[in-house]
A protein has these predicted regions:
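Juxtamembrane membrane-water interface segments immediately following transmembrane helices
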Residues: 1, 131, 153-191
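Extracytoplasmic catalytic/substrate-binding loops of multi-pass membrane glycan-assembly enzymes
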Residues: 1-14, 22, 26
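Transmembrane-helix motifs of polytopic, lipid-linked glycan transferases
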Residues: 33-54, 88, 92, 96
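Short hydrophobic alpha-helices at membrane interfaces in multi-pass membrane enzymes
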Residues: 57-61, 103-120, 150-155
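Short helix- or helix-capping micro-motifs
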Residues: 60-71, 95, 119, 123
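Specific aromatic-rich, kink-prone transmembrane helix
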Residues: 86-104, 115-119, 136-137
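Membrane-interface alpha helices of multi-pass inner-membrane proteins
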Residues: 111-126, 138, 159-164
Length: 191
């Protein structure tokens, strides 16, 4: 799919910051640093999760080797696009979900808000992110045994859906952003 409006805004913000110092390249470098930082953080959190789940040292080293020695991850960080931020956010969301499901962290209101923000970023980084986040959130909500957790997860799903509907149907059109090309209309259904 094409770049989402939100991803384009973040990239433009980085480039405009670089222009304050007379360099578009500085802005591109800032965007790459953002991608690299978020991906490194997500990978570190996933490796930490492996340790907390009791994975052997060998599996932890294999996980680290996969991310350190596979060339695609380094290339991902220097590629100016939407996929690196999306991938890092999905990985971070997966780590948060496992931590929640296994009871590895205490989940207060702040943690639920962070979980909702991560799910929302999945939807904002890519146009088709909603098709990943919303069904997962609904399945999680239905699978929960405790009523309080079910309501919280349902609230996260409803909140993400409401923000995305407002973003796509109110904010974006109000700003005059329109994609009337066939690629924009048909890219999501044909994926």
């Amino acid at each position: 799919t094409w770049h989402s409006v939100f991803t384009t805004w973040v990239f433009a913000l980085c480039v405009r910051f670089g222009r304050l110092f007379g360099s578009d390249n500085l802005g591109c470098c800032l965007y790459m640093a953002l991608q690299t930082g978020l991906l490194c953080y997500a990978v570190a959190r996933s490796l930490s999760l492996m340790r907390r789940l009791g994975s052997s040292r060998r599996w932890q080293l294999a996980g680290m080797a996969f991310f350190c020695l596979t060339p695609i991850w380094g290339a991902y960080c220097i590629m100016l696009g939407k996929d690196t931020l999306f991938t890092a956010t999905v990985l971070l969301w997966l780590v948060q979900t496992v931590e929640w499901a296994r009871g590895l962290r205490r989940w207060g209101p702040g943690r639920w808000a962070l979980y909702a923000l991560t799910a929302l970023l999945i939807c904002l980084w890519r146009n088709n992110g909603l098709y990943l986040a919303l069904p997962c959130l609904l399945v999680f909500a239905l699978a929960l045994a405790r009523r309080g957790d079910r309501l919280r997860m349902g609230g996260v799903a409803a909140g993400v859906l409401a923000v995305m509907l407002a973003f796509d149907n109110l904010l974006v059109p109000a700003l005059g952003i329109v994609d009337n090309r066939a690629s924009g209309v048909y890219s999501l259904p044909f994926q």
